[in-house]
A protein has these predicted regions:
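N-terminal "arm"/small-domain region of PLP-dependent enzymes with the aminotransferase-like
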Residues: 1-53, 261, 369
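PLP-dependent aminotransferase-like
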Residues: 98-156
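Conserved PLP-binding catalytic core of the aspartate aminotransferase-like
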Residues: 293, 297, 309-346, 369-371
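Conserved N-terminal alpha-helix of the aminotransferase class I/II PLP-enzyme fold
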Residues: 33-36, 40-95
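Active-site C-terminal subdomain of aminotransferase-like
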Residues: 216-318
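Active-site phosphate-binding strand-loop segment of PLP-dependent enzymes
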Residues: 135-198
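Conserved active-site segment immediately N-terminal to the catalytic lysine
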Residues: 203-217
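PLP-dependent enzyme catalytic core of the Aspartate aminotransferase-like
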Residues: 1, 147-148, 152-155, 284, ...
Length: 395
């Protein structure tokens, strides 16, 4: 066994590069979080003063205060930190639904929404989207699916899941409308905010959300893995239900431990410390979401000056994550010895990273948090690559 390769690992990308990775922009650490990462990087480092047997109750560092402040920030009543947004979805389904129940999801849902349902032995029914080129989810379809499920099974489904911002096209779904439909039918509503809360304003109660799931490492400037599960007072005791099991021989019990969180949320060190350190900046940055959307729209406008380039998804952009169709580049890549890696290497030569290697027919990109000059630089780089390869570009 050669273990030398594990030492001194690096990403191979310096701070001088512009990172446009679609799932990393909202998770870029603040300076305060980088400091906290070093301070709390050792294992269970936030548990030095744990007296209540749960990380969410730790007072020093102020994790318990953070729980309350995050709940207030999201306009929800109670919060727990989880091992990613996927764990939050699994936990809510596990505590609310029964095996064999049906949940409705949008057809753009992240794969982990499906796996969370499957792990809980639930059935899935999808609300469709309208296909190419906008891929817009049929929000009114939630009501139709509710009625179809009730007619087929004789009972209402046990949960409705909506992806607030999908990971493929960056479409922003009308969560408030789905929330109203769920309220009318009496169906518990889970909103996946992995790409929204933490970078844009999200008000859980305004949206009639019962369970709000977020991603600290995707959108709250935290190191991975950490998720957020927020709920209302009506559901707190059910979702965060405590253990009642006792050993038949020892009599041991763990009555403070919450079942769906495996007793204590597995975010004990760097994840919760970096989330905490970045939180003041997160609270501030959502106030500037309009400017982030403005940058995204500018970027789309510049790239669509390239012949054959089109933004897929709903227009105009409401979010910074976007999917660009780029068929002329794909045709060039087919003849280039680098094949699909052509675009990746051309951008890296210009110190731009984050596009998935091998993609040229279309690509996902995210401008969130970039300075205006960086947005303009990346747009210019694409136009330069196009011109160098004989693709027409509008002046």
């Amino acid at each position: 066994m050669d273990t030398k390769k594990y030492k001194n690992i690096t990403r191979g990308v310096s701070d001088t590069y512009v990172n446009v990775h679609p799932i990393q922009r909202g998770g870029v650490l603040t300076a305060e979080a980088r400091k906290a990462l070093l301070e709390f990087g050792d294992g269970y480092s936030v548990c030095d003063y744990c007296f209540e047997a749960r990380v969410d109750l730790v007072e020093n560092p102020p994790v318990h205060d953070l729980v309350q402040d995050v709940a207030e920030f999201l306009n929800m009543d109670d919060v727990r930190f989880t091992a990613g947004c996927r764990h939050a979805k699994w936990a809510a389904m596990h505590m609310v639904c029964e095996p064999g129940d049906t949940v409705v999801v949008d057809a753009l849902a992240h794969y982990t929404s499906y796996l969370a349902a499957e792990a809980n032995k639930l059935n899935i029914v999808e609300v469709p989207h309208n296909g190419y080129p906008t891929f817009e989810v049929d929000i009114e379809g939630y009501a139709r699916k509710f009625e179809e499920v009730e007619q087929k099974t004789g009972k209402l489904l046990s949960m409705a899941v909506l992806t607030h911002v999908d990971y493929r096209y960056g479409n922003v779904a009308d969560a408030e409308k789905v929330g109203n439909i769920c309220k009318e039918y009496g169906v518990p509503f889970l909103l996946n905010t992995a790409y929204s809360s933490g970078i844009m304003p999200v008000d859980g109660k305004k949206l009639h959300v019962y369970f709000l799931c977020g991603s600290g490492h995707k959108s709250w400037a935290a190191s991975a893995p950490i998720g957020i599960l927020a709920t209302t007072y009506e559901w707190t005791s059910k979702v965060f239900n405590k253990s009642t099991l006792r050993g038949d021989w020892s009599g041991r019990g763990f009555t403070k431990k919450e079942i769906a969180l495996f007793g204590c949320s597995p975010v004990f060190g760097a994840p919760v410390a970096t989330l905490m350190a970045s939180f003041p900046a997160v609270v501030e940055r959502v106030k500037h979401w309009d400017e982030e959307v403005e940058k995204a729209r500018y970027f789309v406008g510049e790239l669509e000056k390239i012949e054959g380039f089109h933004q897929m998804g709903v227009k105009p952009k409401q979010h910074t994550l976007m999917n660009i169709e780029s068929l002329p580049l794909h045709e060039i890549a087919e003849k280039d010895k680098r094949r699909g890696y052509f675009l990746y290497h051309e951008l890296k030569k210009r110190k731009i990273v984050g596009l998935h290697p091998g993609m040229s027919k279309n690509f996902k990109i995210n401008t969130y948090g970039l300075k205006w000059e960086q947005v303009k630089y990346v747009a210019s780089a694409f136009k330069d690559i196009a011109r160098e390869n004989g693709i027409k570009v509008e002046d």
